[in-house]
């Protein structure tokens, strides 16, 4: 079982991530080729089910490519029982061909230097990474190097295109009660369920990059264009992000309590706002900003009526929200959307900040870089002593 293996292995320290456990087994001695420099015979990544406490969502056995890895595959096949408590996939590493359904993970792969392993994407229109667009435009050009295939919508991907890609892994976002992945499940390609977005700790999600670093490369200067070693790069990048985040948090704590911030706008008859223990709720707290739902204990979104928001948040100082496409929304346009916005003090004072996620790589950059979003909220709450806003515009 996973628990028995974990006892025998070397468990990596996860300081913030609650949904991911990584256990390394063996010392990797005798490894050669693609596996050279790997400090384990195989590794186990256990993803906890975010929607059902005490259960596992998925289990991955990462086995380096090469002859030693081939022997490990045979050895584990003999040893393992078939009674696993969750889906188990064996992934040979480094993964050199993948279909990546999630834009922030594409961005992370560029930062780790393993972008050439991206061979297919979904929801191309929503990806704010110029090189991905450029490589996707080369799709169908037989002489092009490392083109990217547009695999359609992540909700209904083009199965034929994915089969033609021959990916070694598919990265996607799992959802509660999804009932599986339909035809994707039948391809017998490892599906990496990237549940990192369900981590409530901002640094918890970022810490998952250690897992992705292990997936996408260990050998220096690979011939397919994967430069450097993704695993140590991920470790050092996370250490840098953590240091910057904690430094910003400490600086913000030295100021008086900041302005109150309200996020998002009304959608239909509902106004979704972050729970007090959600990623955004924690970011606002760490920015030493005031938040009308800071005492709430939910780690997800709160579905509120507009009347509930206005009753509690009329005196809010700053209103910051995201929108997709088109020009920034004027106050007149916002009132056309919902006349009740005029009851907000922030609206009347003109303290409205917007970010267009169709042109600004907000999700791509902030998902694994919480320090960038923390800085943004600190500026909104305490003024520009921390510099200029990067994402939001007044």
Model-predicted segments: where are they?
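N-terminal ligand-binding lobe of clamshell/alpha-beta domains
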Residues: 1-394
């Amino acid at each position: 079982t996973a628990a028995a293996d974990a006892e025998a292995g070397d468990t990596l320290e996860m300081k913030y991530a609650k949904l991911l456990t990584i256990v390394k087994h063996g010392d990797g001695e005798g490894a050669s080729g693609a596996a050279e420099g790997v400090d384990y015979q195989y590794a186990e990544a256990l993803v906890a089910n975010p929607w059902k406490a005490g259960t596992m969502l998925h289990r991955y056995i990462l086995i380096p490519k090469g002859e030693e890895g081939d022997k490990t595959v045979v050895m584990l096949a003999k040893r393992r029982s078939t009674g696993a408590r969750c889906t188990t996939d064996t992934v040979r590493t480094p993964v050199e061909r993948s279909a990546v359904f999630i834009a922030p993970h594409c961005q992370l792969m560029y930062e780790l230097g393993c972008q050439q392993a991206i061979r297919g994407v979904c929801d191309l229109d929503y990806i704010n990474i110029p090189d991905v667009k450029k490589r996707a435009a080369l799709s169908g050009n037989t002489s092009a190097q490392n083109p990217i295939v547009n695999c359609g919508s992540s909700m209904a991907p083009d199965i034929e295109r994915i089969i033609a890609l021959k990916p070694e892994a598919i990265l996607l976002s799992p959802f509660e009660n999804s009932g599986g992945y339909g035809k994707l499940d039948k391809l017998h390609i490892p599906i990496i369920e990237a549940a990192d977005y369900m981590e409530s700790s901002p640094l918890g999600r970022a810490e998952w990059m250690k897992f992705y670093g292990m997936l996408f490369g260990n050998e220096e200067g690979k011939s397919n264009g994967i430069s450097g070693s993704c695993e140590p790069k991920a470790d050092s990048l996370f250490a840098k992000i953590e240091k910057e985040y904690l430094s910003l948090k400490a600086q913000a704590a030295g100021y008086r309590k900041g302005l109150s911030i309200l996020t998002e706008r009304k959608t239909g008859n509902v106004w979704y706002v972050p729970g007090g223990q959600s990623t955004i709720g924690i970011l606002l707290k760490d920015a030493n900003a005031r938040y009308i739902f800071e005492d709430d204990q939910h780690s997800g979104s709160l579905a509120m009526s507009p009347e509930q928001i206005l009753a509690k948040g009329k005196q809010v100082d700053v209103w910051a929200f995201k929108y997709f496409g088109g020009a920034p929304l004027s106050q007149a346009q916002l009132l056309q959307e919902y006349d009740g916005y005029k009851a907000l003090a922030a609206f009347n004072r003109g303290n409205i900040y917007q970010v267009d996620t169709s042109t600004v790589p907000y999700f791509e950059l902030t998902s694994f870089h919480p320090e960038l979003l923390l800085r943004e909220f600190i500026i909104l709450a305490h003024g520009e002593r921390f510099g200029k806003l990067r994402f939001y515009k007044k």
